[in-house]
């Protein structure tokens, strides 16, 4: 089983990593090519391209200038410890043991606009480049064109080492990021967990809660060493429960009703 997550825009480089082990990203040459193009942009260009504030644009202008193809613990941090958004609050890698993180290294992947595909312990230099950014490059009009089928092929390399029910990809990424994967070319079926909360008289996806729940699901897989997708149905963290009637073979729906 491989579970894929989206990255986070929020990053934490202040908290020291609680594990010393790390690995290097697989697509450093590709990231270097993107950085080369990003360095041609002014802070105002970055603000316009990414629809971000001027201070944030200046921060990322400097990040691109500082970025190095050489990754060390001095200029980078393990990806799953550096990302700090809703998904990663749910995953809470800081409280996972080194043994848990070693398991995550084999079963969790993070999709990235700059780095393509990351393992949890791959070193990450700070950046901002969302997958949906229409950043024209030598390979096409946007990052989907840039990455082509590279991410899918990298996932297949991992999936092909699994067999039976364990050869499955669990999609806990956003629509924006999972568009960088080509399901028809994958060497495994895809299961997408969907998390809904009761609000206004019906169940609906509430972005903040759904993002956190994706991280909780990834943690559930890691802590319980899950390889068979049927075991995902037992997920019941923070009040969610599997709804068989609303689910099918490719979409697992989890619902939560608090209050009302």
From Swiss-Prot:
Pfam families assigned: H2O2_YaaD
One GO-annotated biological process of the protein: response to hydroperoxide
GO cellular component, one term: cytosol
InterPro entries cross-referenced by the UniProt entry: YaaA
PANTHER family associated with the record: PEROXIDE STRESS RESISTANCE PROTEIN YAAA, PEROXIDE STRESS RESPONSE PROTEIN YAAA
Similarity section: Belongs to the UPF0246 family.
Protein name: UPF0246 protein BceJ2315_22780
């Amino acid at each position: 089983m491989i579970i894929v997550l989206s990255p986070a825009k929020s990053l934490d480089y202040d908290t020291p990593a609680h594990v010393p082990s790390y690995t290097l990203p697989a697509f450093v040459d590709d990231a270097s090519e993107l950085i080369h193009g990003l360095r041609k942009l002014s802070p105002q260009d970055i603000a316009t391209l990414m629809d971000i504030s001027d201070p944030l644009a200046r921060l990322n202008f400097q990040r691109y200038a500082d970025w190095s193809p050489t990754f060390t613990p001095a200029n980078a941090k393990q990806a799953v410890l550096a990302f700090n958004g809703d998904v990663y609050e749910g995953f809470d890698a800081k409280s996972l043991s080194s043994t848990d993180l070693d398991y995550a290294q084999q079963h969790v992947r993070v999709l990235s606009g700059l780095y393509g595909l990351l393992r949890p312990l791959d070193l990450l230099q700070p950046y901002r480049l969302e997958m949906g950014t229409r950043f024209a490059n030598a390979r096409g009009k946007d990052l989907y064109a840039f990455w082509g089928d590279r991410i899918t092929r990298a996932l297949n390399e991992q999936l092909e080492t699994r067999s039976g029910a364990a050869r499955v990809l669990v999609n806990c990424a956003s629509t924006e990021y999972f568009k960088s994967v080509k399901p028809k070319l994958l060497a495994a079926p895809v299961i997408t967990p969907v998390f809904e909360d009761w609000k206004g008289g019906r169940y609906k996806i509430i972005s903040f809660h759904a993002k956190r729940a994706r991280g909780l699901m990834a943690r559930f897989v890691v802590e319980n060493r899950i390889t068979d997708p049927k075991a995902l149905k037992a997920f019941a963290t923070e009040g969610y429960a599997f709804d068989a009637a609303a689910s099918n073979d490719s979409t697992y729906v989890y619902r939560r009703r608090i209050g009302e």
